[in-house]
């Protein structure tokens, strides 16, 4: 009844205050963790999943190598919510060690956890996380691979071009291939390799993938892209030809204005 819920609320209040008190204590001298961080490690093993979640959040605020190593133990927690909190905390801490630990969560049996892991990788290291995000394209779930492509788009670095290019060519899902083709137009501006990948994408059996490739060629801003666009004008699908005609008009107008 009311007594139970008031007790739960009081526990949360006390726990939150305790965590706030711990953070400044532990934050002094990352190389020599104080007793506070060991208290958080103990709380991460508490029988109550809500306390374990709060402990993960606290470790994320504390940061440092010791917190990352403690959080790693939480990747095998039976609670989905706790594992997600652990991954988010690792993303918040960031750095190479955190990226390595987050990469282990790409094997989690929960699709939601694997998606959160891909997101946390971007938070943890942006460009340095690209090779690890690339591993997520081996996931059997389309939603995880779609999310990995979106995260590469968010990073936006030229190093994402060959990764997205490979996805355009080899992923078994036309939805994922189409997304990768679309994002190539955003990350591959004035990038000749992006033009090469998009040229090959025009041979894809899915008209949607070919349309996304044509739209991306319109953003590349290289004369070589115009030559590839001309191939789209000869496509067997009328929808693709119409889109190629529209994009070619926009590109030429910008080119010669």
Where are these regions (language model features)?
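Bacterial N-terminal signal peptides
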Residues: 12-24
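N-terminal, post-signal-peptide region of Sec/Tat-exported proteins
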Residues: 48-88
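Alpha-solenoid repeat junctions
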Residues: 59, 63, 90, 94, ...
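Short inter-helical turns and helix N-cap capping residues of alpha-solenoid HEAT/ARM repeat scaffolds
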Residues: 47-48, 78-79, 109-110, 140-141, ...
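Amphipathic alpha-helical scaffolding segments comprising HEAT/armadillo-like alpha-solenoid repeats
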Residues: 31-43, 64-76, 95-107, 126-138, ...
């Amino acid at each position: 009844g009311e007594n139970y819920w008031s007790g739960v609320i009081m526990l949360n209040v006390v726990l939150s205050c305790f965590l706030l008190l711990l953070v400044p204590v532990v934050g002094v001298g990352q190389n020599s963790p104080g007793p506070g961080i060991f208290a958080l490690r103990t709380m991460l093993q508490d029988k109550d999943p809500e306390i374990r979640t709060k402990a993960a959040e606290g470790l994320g605020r504390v940061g440092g190598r010791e917190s990352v190593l403690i959080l790693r133990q939480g990747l095998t927690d039976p609670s989905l919510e706790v594992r997600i909190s652990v991954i988010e905390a690792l993303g918040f801490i960031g750095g190479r060690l955190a990226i390595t630990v987050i990469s282990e969560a790409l094997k989690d049996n929960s699709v939601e956890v694997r998606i959160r892991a891909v997101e946390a990788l971007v938070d943890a290291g942006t460009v340095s996380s690209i090779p690890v995000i690339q591993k997520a394209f081996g996931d059997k779930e389309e939603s995880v691979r779609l999310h990995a492509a979106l995260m590469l788009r968010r990073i936006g670095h030229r190093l994402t071009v060959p990764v997205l290019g490979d996805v355009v060519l080899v992923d078994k899902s036309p939805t994922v291939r189409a997304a990768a083709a679309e994002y190539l137009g955003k990350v591959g501006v004035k990038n000749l390799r992006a033009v090469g990948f998009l040229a090959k994408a025009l041979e894809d059996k899915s008209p949607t993938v070919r349309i996304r490739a044509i739209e991306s060629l319109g953003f590349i801003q290289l004369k070589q892209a115009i030559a590839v666009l001309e191939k789209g004008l000869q496509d067997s699908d009328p929808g693709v030809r119409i889109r190629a005609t529209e994009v070619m008009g926009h590109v030429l107008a910008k080119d010669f204005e």
